[in-house]
């Protein structure tokens, strides 16, 4: 199958956050500004008297993601808010991390999906495992929450 000729735009995108209990939160009222860094392992350059003679892989990278959404609610005891879901508070206080053994922080899975199938384009997604999300609040018109994520697990790109 040939690569799609339909270009993704913000209205095609969806961001879903899932915890270790398989409970999902679909980000709503978002700006359409999802970003991801697909860095490779650290590069160790091998020199012989100042001439490059090799390249080796060093430490694994810590890829990053970011996105923002409009503030709708800071906390809720009976329903998930995005901040409660990410920080494991209030209604989400009993959530399980996706990290597993050896990972102390609360981690989640983040999926970005771009669905252009309505225009005969592709329906594609990228899944980020073991993500540590943090948030920053900025007052404005509208007030927004910016999220930054560090990816400590695998990254898988796939067709849906």
Report residues per predicted region:
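Signature of extracytoplasmic/envelope-associated structural regions
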Residues: 1-160
């Amino acid at each position: 199958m040939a690569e799609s000729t339909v270009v993704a735009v913000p209205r095609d995108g969806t961001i879903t956050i899932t915890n270790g209990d398989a409970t999902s939160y679909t980000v709503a009222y978002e700006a359409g500004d999802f970003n991801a860094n697909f860095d490779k392992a650290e590069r160790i350059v091998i020199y012989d008297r100042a001439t490059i003679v090799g390249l080796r892989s060093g430490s694994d990278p810590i890829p990053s993601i970011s996105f923002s959404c409009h503030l709708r609610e800071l906390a809720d005891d009976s329903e998930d808010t995005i901040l409660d879901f990410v920080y494991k508070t209030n209604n989400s206080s009993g959530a399980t991390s996706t990290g597993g053994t050896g990972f102390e922080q609360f981690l989640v899975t983040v999926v970005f999906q771009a669905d252009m199938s309505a225009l005969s384009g592709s329906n594609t997604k990228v899944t980020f495992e073991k993500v540590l999300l943090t948030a920053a609040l900025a007052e404005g018109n509208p007030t927004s929450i910016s999220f930054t994520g560090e990816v400590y697990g695998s990254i898988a790109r796939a067709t849906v």
